[in-house]
């Protein structure tokens, strides 16, 4: 069976492994987008270290879990969002104000909705984590 959404699969794999209590998880196939999402999650303290392992195919990410994720998921369809509308999407996807992050793909790279709001740029919503 083919994998339709690698990002959604990776985030659900991380969430399920956190709930079971695992300390690390292997995510495959690896992609640049998944790597950028993992980088943003690491910068915000949701995961520990992660590394890319080349297996001769698409690659694998090894992610250290620290038990801080309640839920993580991909946002489909990837809604376009303007800089002034982040509050609406926060209310829709996050459980409380200033709790969790929305991950946004912008023209300046992948970042959280808070960074994008500070820079005054919009983009496309790709994931949420809390």
UniProtKB/Swiss-Prot annotation:
Signal peptide segment? none
Cellular component (GO) terms are: ribonucleoprotein complex; ribosome
The keyword Glycoprotein is annotated on this UniProt entry: no
Record-linked PROSITE patterns: RIBOSOMAL_S8
Q: Which Pfam families match?
A: Ribosomal_S8 (PF00410)
Q: Name one GO molecular function term.
A: structural constituent of ribosome
Which keywords does this chain's UniProt record carry?
Ribonucleoprotein, Ribosomal protein, RNA-binding, rRNA-binding
* Presence of the UniProt keyword Ribosomal protein in the record: yes
This protein's source sits in the domain of life called Archaea
Protein family per UniProt: Belongs to the universal ribosomal protein uS8 family.
HAMAP family (alphabetical): Ribosomal_uS8_A
Q: State the function annotated in the UniProt record.
A: One of the primary rRNA binding proteins, it binds directly to 16S rRNA central domain where it helps coordinate assembly of the platform of the 30S subunit.
Cite the record's note on assembly: Part of the 30S ribosomal subunit.
Q: Supply the name of the protein.
A: Small ribosomal subunit protein uS8
Species per Swiss-Prot/TrEMBL record: Thermococcus gammatolerans (strain DSM 15229 / JCM 11827 / EJ3)
């Amino acid at each position: 069976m083919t994998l339709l959404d690698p990002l959604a699969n990776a985030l659900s794999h991380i969430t399920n492994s956190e709930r079971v209590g695992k300390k690390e998880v292997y995510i495959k196939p690896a992609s640049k987008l998944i790597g950028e999402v993992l980088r943003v999650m690491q910068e915000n303290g949701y995961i520990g270290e992660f590394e890319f392992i080349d297996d001769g195919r698409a690659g694998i990410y090894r992610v250290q879990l620290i038990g801080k994720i309640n839920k993580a998921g991909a946002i489909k369809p990837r809604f376009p969002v303007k800089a002034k509308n982040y509050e609406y999407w926060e209310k829709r996807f996050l459980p409380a104000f200033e709790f969790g992050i929305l991950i946004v793909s912008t023209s300046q790279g992948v970042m959280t909705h808070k960074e994008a709001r500070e820079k005054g740029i919009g983009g496309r919503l790709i994931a949420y984590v809390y």
